[in-house]
């Protein structure tokens, strides 16, 4: 299958470089798995600091309460998209924004790659 990228307007040079060099901002599956494992072990503490119920958090991130419960209790592994949803949520909560960085569950490597124009 040919996965050609098509545009309605011509992208600027930096956008073209990002598309061509997407490897510079992708994480390997092993890196993603490590971030997911680190976050999973901290979910109960983060949720307590955010003062939110499992049901409310599940609704925010787009899962059922049962699915979130299984993830928090390590009976189920979360997907990368669920991980990102949780990180984005906890980054917006004042009580947990700094905490996710200090716990090493915030993907600073990914943020640095997105922000580092020279990596592109």
Model-identified regions with their sequence ranges:
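General nucleic-acid-binding
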Residues: 1-19, 108-110
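Short basic helix-loop element that most often maps to the first helix and adjoining turn
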Residues: 1-3, 41-57, 85, 118-119
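A short, Lys/Arg-rich alpha-helix, primarily the initiator
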Residues: 21-49
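Short alpha-helical DNA-recognition segment
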Residues: 51-70
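Short, conserved catalytic or interaction motifs in soluble domains
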Residues: 73
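DNA major-groove recognition helix of helix-turn-helix/homeodomain DNA-binding modules
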Residues: 81-102
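Short, charged recognition helix plus adjacent turn
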Residues: 95-120
């Amino acid at each position: 299958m040919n996965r050609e990228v098509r545009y309605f307007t011509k992208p600027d040079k930096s956008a073209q470089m990002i598309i061509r060099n997407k490897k510079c901002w992708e994480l390997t599956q092993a890196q993603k798995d490590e971030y997911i494992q680190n976050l999973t072990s901290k979910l109960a503490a983060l949720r307590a600091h955010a003062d939110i119920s499992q049901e409310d958090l599940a609704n925010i991130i787009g899962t059922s309460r049962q699915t979130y419960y299984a993830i928090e209790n390590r009976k189920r592994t979360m997907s990368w998209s669920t991980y990102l949803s949780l990180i984005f949520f906890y980054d917006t909560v004042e009580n947990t924004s700094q905490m996710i960085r200090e716990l090493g569950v915030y993907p600073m490597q990914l943020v640095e790659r997105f922000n580092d124009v020279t990596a592109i």
